[in-house]
């Protein structure tokens, strides 16, 4: 595994800047990988799926350290608004969820009271012990075959809009195969 400094440099380059969320995300992912015994996530990239629970700076850092990407189907996003990630070892079936403790912010303030919030958190998050920053929990994650990297499933066509649907994401409603948008789950509306 790379050093904290190396991962912070890579993460800042990918994300566009270094911030407290990047430091926390790098530390969170390093802990998750250590717990699973994955030392080289690049060499073992097909062994890991990571579920992230927030769409903030932390997630970019987790993706860099764990070498997981949405486009490789190894990074899964659950919009729960939590600074947490679950690391699933596909080889062993083991999974660990690592979540930032809310008390870590106060620990950072106490460690560096002379610094502004952002600078204090960056510095403290790089130095505080894992047990002060994070809760970890061994969990069980059932990953359906269609969510695995490399899955090659059937492609179907929506009976209403005619768009293709991959990875068993279709909905059957009143006997018709529909995409989620046409089935009423759209996140957008036509701009008339």
Question: What feature does the model see in each segment?
Answer:
Residues 1-14, 161:
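Short, hydrophobic/aliphatic alpha-helical segments
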Residues 14-32:
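Conserved phosphate/anionic-ligand binding catalytic regions in large, soluble enzymes, centered on
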Residues 47-87:
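A structural-propensity feature for long, helix-poor, extended segments
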Residues 134-146, 160-165:
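Short Cys/His-rich Zn2+-coordinating modules
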Residues 143-155, 168-173:
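Short, flexible, mixed-charge glycine/proline-rich loop motifs
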Residues 158-162, 179-182:
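Short cysteine-rich clusters marking metal-coordination/redox-active sites
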Residues 167-168, 188-189:
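Short, non-ligating residues that shape and space the ligands of small metal-coordination modules
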Residues 173-185:
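Cysteine-rich micro-motifs
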């Amino acid at each position: 595994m790379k050093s904290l400094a190396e991962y912070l440099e890579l993460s800042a380059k990918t994300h566009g800047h270094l911030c407290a969320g990047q430091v926390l995300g790098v530390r969170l992912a390093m802990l998750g990988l250590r717990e699973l015994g994955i030392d080289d996530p690049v060499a073992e990239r097909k062994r890991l799926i990571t579920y992230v629970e927030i769409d903030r700076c932390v997630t970019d850092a987790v993706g860099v350290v764990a070498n997981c990407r949405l486009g490789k189907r190894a990074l899964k996003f659950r919009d729960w608004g939590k600074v947490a990630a679950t690391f699933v070892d596909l080889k062993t079936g083991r999974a660990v969820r690592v979540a930032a403790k809310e008390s870590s912010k106060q620990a950072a303030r106490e460690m560096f009271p002379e610094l502004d919030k952002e600078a204090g958190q960056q510095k403290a998050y790089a130095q505080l012990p894992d047990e002060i920053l994070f809760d970890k929990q061994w969990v069980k994650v059932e990953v359906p075959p269609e969510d695995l990297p490399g899955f090659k499933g059937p492609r179907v066509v929506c009976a209403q809009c005619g768009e293709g649907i991959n990875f068993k994401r279709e909905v059957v409603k009143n006997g018709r195969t529909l995409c989620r948008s046409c089935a009423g789950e759209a996140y957008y509306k036509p701009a008339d």
